[in-house]
A protein has these predicted regions:
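Gly/Thr-rich phosphate-binding beta-strand-loop-beta motif of the actin/hexokinase/Hsp70
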Residues: 2-33
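Phosphate-binding loop and its immediate beta->loop->alpha context
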Residues: 27-155
């Protein structure tokens, strides 16, 4: 009797401008690669828009495509990973937003994107990062992913 349990492995490229997720489904002795982008299979923009009065959050492609519309009512944050270099924080709708919290919203967007396409909750992933990303920035990414319910297994 062979083991036919379906197993998944996920990888995330957490980029400054865009993010992408890939999944590998393993069943029996074969793998199937599944790319998770937006509806057109494009990478997800690393942007977050936070409503200045209500605190509602828009992320990814929606935030990117609605940036003009959202610019008046939202604090628009792009290139999320570049915030890791700065002592950055913003008080928006009564909540103190840090780079870690903003990055967590991007991870949630990626996780939701996978779930909408497969009904699978991405709970673990390997995350691709630039070679020079120091330990403090990796810690921000690890904490942000954990806030989104994703355990980073390793960085590559």
């Amino acid at each position: 009797m062979s083991d036919t349990k379906l197993k998944y492995c996920f990888g995330i490229d957490f980029g400054t401008t865009n993010c992408a997720t890939v999944g590998y489904a393993y069943i029996g002795n074969s793998y199937e690669k599944i790319l998770y982008g937006d509806d057109e299979q494009r990478p997800i923009p690393s942007v977050v828009a936070i409503n200045k009065s209500g605190g509602s959050v828009h992320t990814g492609r929606e935030a990117w495509e609605r940036r003009q519309e959202l610019s008046q009512e939202c604090e628009y944050i792009s290139s999320v990973k570049s915030l890791f270099d700065k002592e950055w924080s913003r008080l928006i709708a009564g909540k103190l937003w840090t780079p870690e919290l903003v990055a967590a919203e991007v991870f949630k967007c990626l996780q939701q994107n996978v779930y909408e396409r497969t009904s699978i909750i991405m709970e673990e992933a390997v995350v691709a990062i630039p070679v020079g990303l120091n330990a403090a920035k990796r810690r921000i990414l690890r904490n942000a992913a954990a806030s989104a319910g994703i355990k980073i297994l390793s960085f590559v």
